């Protein structure tokens, strides 16, 4: 198994900053935005976007944590552990995840969101888009497009969980 770092901490920070600027540029009503981090690493990326929005626009954007396990179609799971303490009706929810692959996690996240309310709009921000979609889902904000083969994996490490920030590509062959 070969593992290669393809994004270091500086490049990751730059990608998150770029996503933040794109969110600012493309949204007229920034005060209606709610960030929805998909557990686990999507939550930490969403927190970083939230911090950058505060620094750049002096905005206090609410953040919710989504657990998609109870809404997945490929895994049967326990109960939903999402943390949604705000009203999402009429808001512009931006789902945030580390990697976009088949689209199944995002579909589950959308199901979770609409089970809690009716947002005006749902967008998607991902740190890495690796392709290979099984569902018609596309990200609105992408940090890095990293085409992979089906056998390769993308591993996102964040300081809060893993002690460092990086993105690695893993080739099992």
UniProtKB/Swiss-Prot annotation:
Task of the protein: Regulates transcriptional attenuation of the pyrimidine nucleotide (pyr) operon by binding in a uridine-dependent manner to specific sites on pyr mRNA. This disrupts an antiterminator hairpin in the RNA and favors formation of a downstream transcription terminator, leading to a reduced expression of downstream genes.
One of the protein's GO biological processes: DNA-templated transcription termination
Gene assigned in the entry: pyrR
Subunit structure: Homodimer and homohexamer; in equilibrium.
Keywords from the named record: Glycosyltransferase, RNA-binding, Transcription, Transcription regulation, Transcription termination, Transferase
Principal EC category: transferase
Reactions catalysed, as given in the entry: UMP + diphosphate = 5-phospho-alpha-D-ribose 1-diphosphate + uracil
Family of the protein in this entry: Belongs to the purine/pyrimidine phosphoribosyltransferase family. PyrR subfamily.
Positions occupied by motif PRPP-binding: 93-105
Keyword Glycosyltransferase: yes
Alphabetized HAMAP family for the sequence: PyrR
Any matching Pfam family: Pribosyltran
Transmembrane segments annotated in the record for this chain: none
InterPro entries in alphabetical order: PRibTrfase_dom (IPR000836), PRTase-like (IPR029057), PyrR (IPR023050), PyrR_bifunctional (IPR050137)
NCBIfam families reported in the protein's UniProt record: PRK05205.1-4, PRK05205.1-5
Enzyme Commission code: 2.4.2.9
A molecular function GO annotation: RNA binding
Name of the protein in question: Bifunctional protein PyrR
Organism, scientific name: Streptococcus thermophilus (strain ATCC BAA-491 / LMD-9)
């Amino acid at each position: 198994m070969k593992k290669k770092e393809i994004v270091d901490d500086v490049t990751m920070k730059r990608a998150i900053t770029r996503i933040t600027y794109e969110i600012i540029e493309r949204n007229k009503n920034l005060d209606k935005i709610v960030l929805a981090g998909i557990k686990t690493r999507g939550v930490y990326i969403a927190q970083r976007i939230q911090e950058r929005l505060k620094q750049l626009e002096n905005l206090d954007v609410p953040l919710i944590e989504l657990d998609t396990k109870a809404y997945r179609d490929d895994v049967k799971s326990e109960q939903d552990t999402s943390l949604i303490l705000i009203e999402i009706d009429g808001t512009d929810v931006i789902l945030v995840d580390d990697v976009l692959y088949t689209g199944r996690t995002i579909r589950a996240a959308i199901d979770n969101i609409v089970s809690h309310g009716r947002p005006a709009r749902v967008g998607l921000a991902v740190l890495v888009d690796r392709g290979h979609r099984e569902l018609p889902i596309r990200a609105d904000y992408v940090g890095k497009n990293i085409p992979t083969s089906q056998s390769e994996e993308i591993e996102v490490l964040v300081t809060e969980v893993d002690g460092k920030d990086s993105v690695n590509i893993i080739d099992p062959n």
